[in-house]
């Protein structure tokens, strides 16, 4: 009966479950990692979940070295793994192959897009959806059917090392981009797995530490993106976080996984742990006597699959010792089987090498990566230095090791394929490719700062900041680095006689700017940097984040004015670490906000970003029709270049008998406007924009007064509108 394709996924899953032995059920909840580099494949292919063995590298046992994984290699590896899993399963049930994919599939030659924090800077929902669509297509093409993405944790303390994986500090951005990603994955037959449910960091930005979030904070802030990913994005899996909330580890939190996720939101997929998260219930949180009990405790509270390795013996022991019932086991197995039928894995589990090679990193994908990189770059400061002109700037000194490294970021979260792509360029290579025939571009060595800075028309410094999981920061200044002599092609010279300058990057920037005021700093980083020590010394600052494989070209072309920057900050940049946590949507204070020596204002506010052109917003008005609210108007490009502006709508509520954030982003629109052109715009706000939890935690449209602000950043207001709600009716 389970082979009958005319039946629903639920019906087929129930029929198959009824035929399965206890052992086979246990294996469907077991998992295994990629093959080891020892030459022996110790994986058990009866397990229902396998990490993609087409991971970003592979070991050549004859040559004894690592090689990049080609698309053809990826398909062959996954085909073999799926084939073996079918052969070794009594009912021919294939394993689900999963992988990471925050900004590209994490293997071989997959397209490498900007990191999520950079994508968020675009304020472009459609772009993010298209990026996810490409990632989904590339994953599906090689046989990866589940991605551990997107991250929809809200980062409100930039000391957290995983800020780069997020869409920033704002609830609406995380909701919209999370939904866009989930739709892009799921529409291609790839399971989206929003993570990490929930919070994922504690006080001081410390990863995986206990969360002190109240039920109000959880519902108003941290639940929201997950809820929308489930209800609107169609996510069919969820990954739990390592941390605890109110002392209960999220991996075994029945309130989160059953009461909220399943009963309240209607989630019908399966829940997976963050890697070794179930073991952490015992080893880390110490709330059970052993791992076996931790596994059972998690499953009884709504958890399904432990990743990346889960021994069937652990589940078997839990059953034999009475920690776990077969009824609970069946519930989890059913959830997994239902998704395998829905994906079509039970009927057609294999993929085509030819299709994969046509799909992965094709011209359209690379063009999208280029567009994404351009939209993600933010111009923070410009005293008129940018854009540079080859008519005036004839000689440029480039400094910083990062200038000749592909700006993709180095952590687990996305592809390393860009490292092997012959047509991807570092910023230095791109500068020389596109402008080397007009401008002399010199890659400055460690002992040439004074000489080159004095004799060049401009200088560019690329910062070196390595961030990611396990790299939480106690400070947010540029880290000290060792600048080594390099050949002109960027390769390190290892001669011991060469000078190494252990230099503070801040001091280096100041030194360059001292000799050449036409200094541009390009930030290559994953979270905000304290610029107070050098900002006043330089002529321009570009926040580039980690812009992906096409980021080098995008940076070079921005510096020379091929297009106007349009990125906006998805996260607040503080003046110093002493202000943290600092975010715009804070609640008002009883006596003020800030320290004696600091008024609490940021260095750069949320939503901020400069342009090479100028815009004028005119005739803006509030439109209320049948209970729906929109801000309408027209925007004119009155500058000298084509460009794009991101208009933002914030609300501030008062008189509702509960303290609410001073401002909340409720709508935005990225608008392309050609030079001299006038474009009409409408930014709609849904009714839920005016909902909030009252003192009794009732979520509704309560009587209240609001100020709606049309703005280009949270601090740059174009026009305010007043609105009142009485008896759930909106009135101007």
Regions found by a protein language model. Name each.
Residues 717-721:
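Extracellular and select intracellular beta-sandwich modules with Ser/Thr-enriched
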Residues 1-696, 700-716, 731-732:
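Glycoside hydrolase catalytic-domain context in secreted enzymes
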Residues 723-730:
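Short beta-strand edge segments in extracellular beta-sheet folds
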């Amino acid at each position: 009966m389970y082979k009958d394709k005319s039946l629903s996924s639920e019906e087929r899953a129930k029929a198959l479950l009824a035929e399965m032995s206890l052992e086979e059920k246990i294996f469907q909840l077991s998992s295994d990692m990629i093959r080891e580099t020892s030459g022996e494949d110790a994986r058990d292919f009866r397990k229902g979940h396998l990490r993609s063995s087409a991971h970003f590298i592979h070991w050549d046992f004859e040559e004894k070295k690592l090689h990049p994984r080609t698309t053809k290699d990826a398909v062959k590896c996954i085909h073999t793994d799926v084939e073996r899993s079918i052969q070794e399963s009594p009912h021919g049930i294939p394993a689900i192959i999963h992988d990471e994919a925050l900004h590209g599939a994490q293997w071989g030659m997959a397209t490498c897009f900007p990191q999520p924090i950079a994508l968020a800077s675009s304020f472009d929902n459609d772009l993010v959806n298209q990026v996810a669509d490409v990632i989904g297509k590339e994953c599906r093409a090689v046989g990866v059917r589940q991605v551990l993405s997107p991250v929809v944790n809200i980062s409100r303390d930039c000391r957290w090392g995983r800020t780069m994986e997020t869409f920033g500090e704002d609830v609406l951005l995380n909701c919209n981009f999370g939904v866009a990603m989930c739709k892009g994955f799921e529409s291609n037959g790839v399971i989206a797995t929003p993570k990490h449910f929930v919070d994922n960091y504690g006080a001081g930005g410390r990863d995986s530490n206990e969360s002190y979030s109240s039920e109000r904070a959880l519902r108003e802030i941290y639940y929201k993106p997950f809820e929308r990913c489930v209800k609107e994005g169609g996510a069919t899996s969820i990954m739990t976080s390592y941390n605890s909330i109110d002392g209960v580890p999220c991996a075994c939190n029945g309130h989160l996984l059953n009461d909220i996720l399943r009963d309240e939101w209607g989630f019908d997929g399966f829940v997976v742990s963050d890697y070794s998260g179930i073991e952490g219930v015992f080893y880390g949180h110490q709330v059970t006597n052993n791992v076996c009990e931790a596994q059972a405790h998690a499953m009884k509270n709504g958890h399904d699959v432990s990743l990346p390795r889960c021994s069937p013996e652990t589940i078997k022991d839990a059953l034999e010792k009475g920690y776990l019932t077969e009824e609970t086991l069946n519930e989890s197995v059913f959830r997994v089987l239902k998704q395998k039928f829905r994906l079509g894995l039970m009927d057609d589990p294999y993929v085509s090498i030819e299709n994969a090679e046509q799909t992965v990193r094709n011209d359209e994908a690379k063009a999208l990566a280029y567009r994404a990189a351009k939209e993600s770059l933010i111009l923070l400061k410009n005293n008129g230095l940018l854009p540079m002109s080859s008519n005036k700037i004839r000689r440029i000194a480039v400094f910083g090791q990062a200038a000749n490294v592909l700006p993709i970021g180095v952590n687990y979260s996305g592809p390393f394929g860009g490292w092997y792509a012959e047509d991807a360029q570092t910023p230095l290579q791109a500068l020389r490719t596109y402008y080397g025939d007009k401008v002399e571009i010199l890659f400055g060595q460690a002992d040439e700062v004074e000489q080159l800075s004095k004799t060049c028309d401009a200088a560019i410094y690329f910062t070196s900041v390595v961030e990611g999981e396990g790299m939480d920061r106690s400070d947010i200044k540029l880290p000290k680095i060792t600048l080594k002599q390099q050949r002109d092609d960027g390769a390190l010279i290892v001669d011991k006689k060469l000078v190494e300058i252990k230099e503070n990057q801040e001091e280096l920037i100041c030194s360059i700017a001292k000799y050449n005021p036409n200094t541009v700093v390009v930030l290559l980083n994953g979270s905000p940097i304290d610029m107070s020590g050098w900002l006043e010394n330089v002529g321009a600052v570009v926040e580039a984040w980690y812009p992906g494989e096409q980021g080098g070209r995008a940076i070079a072309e921005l510096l020379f004015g091929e297009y106007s920057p349009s990125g906006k900050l998805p996260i607040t940049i503080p003046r110093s670490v002493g202000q943290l946590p600092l975010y715009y949507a804070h609640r008002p204070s009883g006596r003020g906000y800030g320290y004696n020596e600091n008024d609490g204002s940021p260095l750069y506010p949320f939503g901020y970003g400069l342009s090479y052109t100028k815009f004028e917003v005119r005739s803006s008005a509030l439109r209320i029709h049948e209970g729906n609210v929109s801000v309408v108007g027209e925007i004119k490009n009155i500058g000298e270049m084509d460009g794009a502006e991101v208009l933002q709508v914030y609300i501030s509520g008062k008189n509702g008998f509960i303290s609410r954030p001073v401002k909340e982003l409720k709508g935005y629109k990225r608008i392309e406007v050609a030079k001299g052109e006038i474009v009409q715009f409408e930014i709609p706000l849904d009714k839920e924009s005016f909902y909030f939890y009252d003192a009794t935690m009732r979520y509704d449209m309560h009587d209240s007064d609001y100020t709606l602000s049309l703005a280009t950043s949270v601090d740059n207001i174009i026009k305010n509108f007043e609105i009142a709600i009485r008896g759930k009716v909106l009135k101007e």
